[in-house]
Amino acid sequence: MFKFTQHNGIVMPLDIANIDTDIIIPKQFLQKVNKLGFGKYLFHNWRFIDENQSQINPNFILNIEKYKKSSILLTRDNFGCGSSREHAVWALLDYGFKVIIAPSFSDIFYNNSFNNKLLLITLPNNQIDKFFNIINQNPGIYFNIDLLKNEIKVEKKIYSFQIDKFRRFCLLNGLDDIDLTLKNIEKIDSYEKKICNFLIKRKKFVS
């Protein structure tokens, strides 16, 4: 069970708005239904020059040595827009990203991310601009994300962020939708026992 409390990692700056899920992972790589192995397809059309991934695009930031082990992504507005594919979140996590910082996210991507324990931090544009400037001056810099304190530590400076209390609780305790459901299994069992006779009678009535 993964519990998110703190994370210290290299920040990759991706100064592009409206990055959709087809850019995050193209549709031809969505054949599997488990969550593993999608990291190699992350940003495929930007990372590689050819479809077979034999030619790396040297100009894409994730291929630059300092950013290959990035685990925090800094980007722009409306990240994760487009289709609702959950594979986009799986690809980010499988590559190694733990946190994404942006001014805004697509609603469906936002929900998918927290359901898979990927922390999304929303900050105003002026703060995002400041972070981009810091990273451009210090390539490969580490940010420390403290979910217990809702703080981002950059060198000796501390920046606060807000997050939905329920989402925060789930991340801190390593809970997903299934875990939350199982916490109420006794109530669910009790409810099902109460409705059982009604369902049987209804079934007989219909037949």
Swiss-Prot record:
Signal sequence segment: none
Please name the InterPro entries in this protein's record. 3-IsopropMal_deHydase_ssu, Aconitase/3IPM_dehydase_swvl, AconitaseA/IPMdHydase_ssu_swvl, IPMI_Swivel, LeuD
So, what pathway does this thing act in? Amino-acid biosynthesis; L-leucine biosynthesis; L-leucine from 3-methyl-2-oxobutanoate: step 2/4
User: What Gene3D superfamilies does UniProt report for this protein, alphabetically?
Assistant: Aconitase, domain 4
Q: State the reactions this protein catalyses.
A: (2R,3S)-3-isopropylmalate = (2S)-2-isopropylmalate
One MF annotation (Gene Ontology) recorded for this entry: 3-isopropylmalate dehydratase activity
According to the UniProt record, what class of enzyme is this? lyase
Q: One Pfam annotation, family name?
A: Aconitase_C
Tell me its EC number(s), please.
4.2.1.33
A biological process term (GO) from this entry? L-leucine biosynthetic process
Q: Might you report a single GO cellular component term? A: 3-isopropylmalate dehydratase complex
Keywords annotated in UniProt: Amino-acid biosynthesis, Branched-chain amino acid biosynthesis, Leucine biosynthesis, Lyase, Plasmid
The record's note on quaternary structure and interaction partners says: Heterodimer of LeuC and LeuD.
Give the protein's function: Catalyzes the isomerization between 2-isopropylmalate and 3-isopropylmalate, via the formation of 2-isopropylmaleate.
**HAMAP family the UniProt entry points to:** LeuD_type1
Family the UniProt entry places it in: Belongs to the LeuD family. LeuD type 1 subfamily.
Protein's recorded name: 3-isopropylmalate dehydratase small subunit
In the UniProt record, the gene name given for this protein reads leuD
